[in-house]
Curated annotation (Swiss-Prot):
Keywords: ATP-binding, Hydrolase, Nucleotide-binding. GO terms for molecular function: 5-oxoprolinase (ATP-hydrolyzing) activity; ATP binding. Forms a complex composed of PxpA, PxpB and PxpC. InterPro entries: Glyco_hydro/deAcase_b/a-brl, LamB/YcsF/PxpA-like. Its EC number is 3.5.2.9. SUPFAM superfamilies: Glycoside hydrolase/deacetylase (SSF88713). It holds the Pfam family LamB_YcsF. Belongs to the LamB/PxpA family. It comes from Staphylococcus carnosus (strain TM300). It is an enzyme of class 3 (hydrolase). Catalyzes the cleavage of 5-oxoproline to form L-glutamate coupled to the hydrolysis of ATP to ADP and inorganic phosphate. This is 5-oxoprolinase subunit A. It catalyses: 5-oxo-L-proline + ATP + 2 H2O = L-glutamate + ADP + phosphate + H(+). The gene is pxpA. The keyword NADP does not apply.
Amino acid sequence: MQVDLNCDLGEAFGNYSFGGDHQIIPLITSANIACGFHAGDENVMNETVKLAKEHGVGIGAHPGFHDLQGFGRRNIDMAPDEIYTLVAYQLGALSAFSRIHDVKINHVKPHGALYNMGARDKDIAHAIAQAVYDVDPSLILVGLSNTLLISEAEAVGLKTASEVFADRRYESNGQLVSRKESDAVISDTEAAINQVVKMVKDNKVTAKDGTEIDIQADTICVHGDGAHALEFVSKIRERLTKEGISITKLGG
């Protein structure tokens, strides 16, 4: 049994520091690197690609809406062709730095509102998937388990990775509880670890209302901007190892 452990990184920009990338990156197997729209900038992207390469961590593009103020977590009404170019543009930006450092981009994971809209809306999901395929059909598209983003990616011919969240609660339909709700984020380390182990070993998660739902766990996300991110990653890794679960980057 194996699983990938990923984290959203490279989200600082300009004079604003963000997250504990240098402490977290040795503990993960895949990094989702912000591409300058919801967070990150050219200097941070360059440094984060370099850092990921140094630690043998899989490099992923993390495209989002052009929304620094809202950190890419606000829904923006865009046509599918606009979503397509939005994603392709950001993949191009990260590709430049991957070439500079002679390392290949391994995967793509949309950020925030774009990720959630792609999980629910078939046209948006298709636009994201088609953009990724047209830029590089060998890339793995990461999406919320059992959602339209995964099925549309498979339909266009992409490899996929179904993602689960260590630090988020679930609705009974498999969607994430909205961050607007006070209990959307799990701050208790033990609760997060127990949720992860159940998802990976049993392919089940307990929803907010107590419902047991099926879930596919190819990769586990811990948010790099979370207050407990470093503690979560460290202890989740330790527990998975004790459970005999191999932690391996996407694609092996």
